[in-house]
Every structure is written in C-alpha cells, then in structure tokens.
C-alpha cells in the first residue's frame, strides 16, 4: 500500500489536522475506557514534538447533525488528553469556519465532528471548510476508515497534503502482513452469534486460510450442517446449505473447517446455569450449546500452535460466564503462546484478551470493529483508498 506517512513529513510550523478515533465509552461525564485515546496519542505527540500547530477531532456517539448537546461533547476526552500531556488543552466548539489560532507545538481539540452539517454525507462544501484549516491532513482513525465521511474522506481530497497517522499505518501494515502475504499455515478464528452477520467474512477467509475455525452461535450452524443435533441452541437453519458449501469448498482444496467433537451445554442462558459436558453426538433436544469441550479446544490449540498466521475475530463460547469460558480461554492461551503472527480484532475478542490478560502476547490487536471486518472481507476502505490516490499525486 503506497500512502504518505506522517512520520515522513516535515511538520514544523505547519497546521496539522488529525482525524482520530476517540469514540470512547463515557459515563457521568467521565471516560470509562481510554484505550482508543491512548492509541491516538502517539500521532498527536509526534506532531506536537515536530513543532506543528496541531488540531485533532473525533466523533463521539451518535449526535444529531447541526444540534450540539452537552452529552455529545468531547470534553471528557479532552480531560483525559490533558492528563496524559500534563497540560491544559483547549476545546474549540465552533471550528468549521476557523477563527482560532494554534501555536507551534500546541494541541487543540475540535468538538465532535459528527455534529457538523454535511459530515456523515461527506458533503464537499463541509470537507473543503475542514481542508482550509490545515496544511496537512492526517487520517489516524482506522475504526472509521470504512466510512466515507467529510472528516475521513472528503478532507483528504482537498487538503494540500493527506497522510496516514502512526496508528493507521500500523493497522494497515499488520493487516497486510496477515492477509496479503501470510506465513503458512494460516488459521482464522471467526466467532459470534450469527453466520448471517459474518457470512462475507467467512466466505472471503474460506478462500485464503488453511483452517477456518468457527465459534459461538456460528459453530452450531456448522454442527447442524454435519447432521448433528444442536437442540435449542442458537442456530440459523436457513444457512445450513451455505455452511455445507463452505465445508465442501474448503475440503476440495485441502483446507478444513474443524468441527467440535465435544460441547458444553446448559438448559438456559444464565450466569448460574450448570455446565454439562457432552459428546457432540449426544446433544438433547432441550440442550443449548454454550461452549466447545476440552477435546475440541485442545484440537484447536494444536492447530494454532503450528500456525504461521492467526487471524482472530470472536470467541468460541459464552466466555462471559466462566463455566462456559474454558474453550475461549484455551484458544486465547494457545494464541498467546503461539510462535506465529497473530492479529486480533473486534470488541468481544478484545474483551477476551483483557479477561485472560494476554494483551502483550498477541502480535497485533486492531482497535477497529467494522473496518477490521470489512478489510477481512476484502472490501476497499474509502478513507485508505483516498490516501493512496493522493500519494500518487
């Protein structure tokens, strides 16, 4: 991928506009998880140290365009940034028309960009106003790279220079390493409740990987496709033919979708529901499958240990309940100890990484949800495509 990297530019005295992804959870005016802010700080601090006049904006929540409300304010985010920098940071409420000055080496935060009219629909007039504020536009929000909006795509068309930030560059390099030229064997783990929401990902990965591990509710549809009884488990019966096709298609080229030989069941979805281990052939009509059993988990751990590349998106069981979390724990630990390159992404996956404390043992953790999935699907990310276009002049 050929794009300009912010680290390649001389930024001294330049007006730099950074689009970051600081869409963090806020409760009672306080940020409850600052991971995305921390991830964005490297680009911000790099530009400040370089002596640039630094402006950063992000979206937060889902505000109504043209109507600013206090709960949509980036103030809680600014409080965290100020604390990290150890200095006061200005928050500029009305900024699209300019009218504010930034000193060399200073950072100002521009209020929630999704409040601006024309932002979501990528209106040129809005994008041109943004571009007029800067000499260099830096896209650092991989989490919104799959959306063409005025602050992620439009501004990149009109800014004098458009570059990728440190975080975005790292994300794209990691994705390219895992998907464009993966070390073999390549294993993908795709979990989640529904095949329908991950169908395009499953189809795209089924053509690339050596083993496609399915987990969660998705796995039940594949179990059913193999003629197993899944009882009252979450299962999309209308997608059984699709699951069969994927199994056959992969087998035809010597690849596989490993199917569980043992499962952990309960009768209802409840934190206190007792876990019952069964062979995959012995599931009763009133059972619900909530996890894979130890034999299946060990089989996956052995596959992961031999992998050159591991792409991980989603748990293999209801790991938020400990009695149904052993499968996900075994898989997580196998990934943590695997010598291969591991790339993980998605909210549930990150929750599992945090729960089992393997943050520093996964090669690369993507901060993005939707964009990560769309990249896995092989889709063009508009915010990245425009950076490549601009780099070619």
Curated annotation (Swiss-Prot):
GO terms for cellular component: cytosol. One of its GO terms (biological process) is gluconeogenesis. Belongs to the phosphoglycerate kinase family. Signal peptide: none annotated. GO terms for molecular function: ADP binding; ATP binding; phosphoglycerate kinase activity. Its EC number is 2.7.2.3. SUPFAM superfamilies: Phosphoglycerate kinase. Keywords: ATP-binding, Cytoplasm, Glycolysis, Kinase, Nucleotide-binding, Transferase. It is an enzyme of class 2 (transferase). It catalyses: (2R)-3-phosphoglycerate + ATP = (2R)-3-phospho-glyceroyl phosphate + ADP. Coiled coil: none annotated. Substrate binds at residues 21-23, 36, 59-62, 114, 147. Its main location: cytoplasm. Monomer. Pathway: Carbohydrate degradation; glycolysis; pyruvate from D-glyceraldehyde 3-phosphate: step 2/5. It is found in: Cytoplasm. Pfam families: PGK (PF00162). This is Phosphoglycerate kinase. InterPro entries: Phosphoglycerate_kinase (IPR001576), Phosphoglycerate_kinase_CS (IPR015911), Phosphoglycerate_kinase_N (IPR015824), Phosphoglycerate_kinase_sf (IPR036043). ATP binds at residues 198, 320, 346-349. The keyword S-adenosyl-L-methionine does not apply. The lineage of its organism: Bacteria, Pseudomonadati, Pseudomonadota, Betaproteobacteria, Nitrosomonadales.
């Amino acid at each position: 991928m050929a794009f300009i990297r912010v680290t390649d530019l001389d930024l001294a005295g330049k007006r730099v506009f950074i689009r970051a992804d600081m869409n963090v959870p806020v409760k009672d005016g306080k940020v409850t998880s600052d991971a995305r802010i921390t991830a964005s700080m490297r680009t911000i601090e790099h530009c400040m140290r370089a002596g640039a006049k630094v402006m950063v904006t992000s979206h937060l929540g889902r505000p109504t365009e043209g109507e600013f409300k206090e709960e949509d304010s980036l103030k809680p985010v600014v409080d965290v940034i100020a604390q990290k920098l150890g200095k006061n940071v200005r928050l500029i409420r009305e900024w699209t028309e300019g009218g504010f000055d930034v000193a060399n080496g200073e950072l100002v935060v521009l209020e929630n960009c999704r409040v601006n009219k024309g932002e979501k629909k990528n209106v040129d007039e809005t994008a041109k106003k943004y571009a007029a504020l800067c000499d260099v536009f830096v896209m650092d929000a991989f989490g919104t790279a799959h959306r063409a909006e005025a602050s992620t795509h439009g501004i990149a068309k009109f800014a004098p220079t458009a570059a990728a930030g440190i975080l975005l560059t790292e994300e794209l390099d990691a994705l390219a390493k895992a998907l464009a030229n993966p070390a073999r064997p390549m294993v993908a783990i795709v979990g989640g409740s529904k095949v329908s929401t991950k169908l395009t990902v499953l189809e795209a990965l089924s053509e690339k990987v050596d083993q496609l591990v399915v987990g969660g509710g998705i796995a039940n549809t594949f179990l059913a496709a193999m003629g197993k009884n899944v009882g009252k488990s979450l299962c999309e019966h209308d997608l059984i033919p699709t699951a069969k096709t994927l199994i056959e298609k992969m087998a035809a080229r010597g690849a596989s979708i490993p199917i569980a030989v043992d499962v952990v069941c309960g009768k209802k979805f409840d934190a206190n529901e007792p876990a019952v281990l069964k062979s995959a052939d012995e599931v009763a009509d009133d059972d619900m499958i909530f996890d894979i059993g130890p034999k299946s988990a060990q089989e996956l751990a052995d596959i992961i240990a031999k992998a050159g590349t591991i792409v991980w998106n989603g748990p293999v069981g209801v790991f938020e309940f400990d009695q149904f979390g052993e499968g996900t724990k075994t898989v997580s630990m196998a990934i943590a100890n695997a010598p291969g390159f591991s790339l993980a992404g998605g909210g549930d996956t990150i929750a599992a990484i945090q729960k089992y404390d393997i943050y520093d043992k996964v090669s690369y953790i993507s901060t993005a949800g939707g964009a990560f999935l769309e990249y896995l699907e092989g889709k063009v990310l508009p915010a990245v495509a425009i950076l490549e276009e601009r780099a070619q002049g």
